[in-house]
Amino acid sequence: LLFQTKGNLKNPLKKVYSGKVAMLANGPSMKNVLPRLTTDEFKNTDFIVLNFFGSMDIFTQIRPKHFCMADPMFFQENHNHDRVMKLFDDLNKKVDWEMNLYIPASLKRQFLAFSGLHNSHIHIVPLNLTVYTGYEEFRHYFYRHGLSMPSVVTVALMAIYVGINSGYSEIDLYGVDHTFFDSLTVNSKNQLCICDTHFYDKNKVELKPMLRWDSTVWRMSDYLEEKMAVFKNHDIMAAYAVSQGVR
């Protein structure tokens, strides 16, 4: 494990926060939560946001302290290029408060070149994505010290890890619907398709082939294997949260 970390043994996360943090994911149920984010219900709550939340109008109203990115589309050319570039432009122009942006450590240089981010209020925090698969007691030690983290098969797992290791005692999850199989089907070309819905979708979402970051279509076996890893790593994070006294 120490060799896999490539000599980077410094823990980037410090327990300098406390209380409650709300992690805002992109599932369709977030539509019901958005109107409440600026009410007293969330008055003493910090926020962790993900992906394209930075292009939402409410982003500048709740002024999140934490932002997580892990999807390859934020680090290199892809079929979502225009949308990704708009997000980076929004972050450069709109963020006038101190905010941590968490990314994979191995992609920091690539991210800075690709994103063009130059906002001094945004602090890049590189995370060690090394995965440890051994004994639980060792895994928790490595997690605490930033030597390892769960497999980031979904950015929500990165956000939960950030919340735990930043010192929060309670992490509330919103929009983590994980409706991966609700509309799963194949089209006439035998391509795997789904209606992939997010809370920020303004138009009716159409059934379309499921594309990877490199624009190739997912195979069913690969897709199911990845989603199994999502739920397995949620179990791992739940055990880690309990070990750290976080609920």
Residue spans of the language-model regions?
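Metal-ion/cofactor- or nucleotide/acyl-coenzyme-handling active-site neighborhoods
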Residues: 1-247
